[in-house]
Amino acid sequence: MTTKLLFVCLGNICRSPAAEGVFLHLIEQRQLTDQFLVDSAGTGGWHVGNPADRRMQAAARRRGI
């Protein structure tokens, strides 16, 4: 059975995409990707279509995520 997991924040450009990325990284390390369906979303539509915040992307890269 696949577990569905949704990370939610206000704009979906910083916190929830970061949480999604960290979780995906962890399940990949443990070879569990086939057991989870992971996504992120925002409660507001201000940033629809925008990539994750560049500072968050840089922080994730520094941590190997």
Curated annotation (Swiss-Prot):
It comes from the Bacteria. Keywords: Hydrolase. SMART domains: LMWPc. It holds the Pfam family LMWPc. Signal peptide: none annotated. One of its GO terms (molecular function) is protein tyrosine phosphatase activity. The keyword Cell membrane does not apply. The active site is at residues 9, 15. SUPFAM superfamilies: Phosphotyrosine protein phosphatases I. The keyword Hydrolase applies. Belongs to the low molecular weight phosphotyrosine protein phosphatase family. This is Uncharacterized protein in rpcF 3'region.
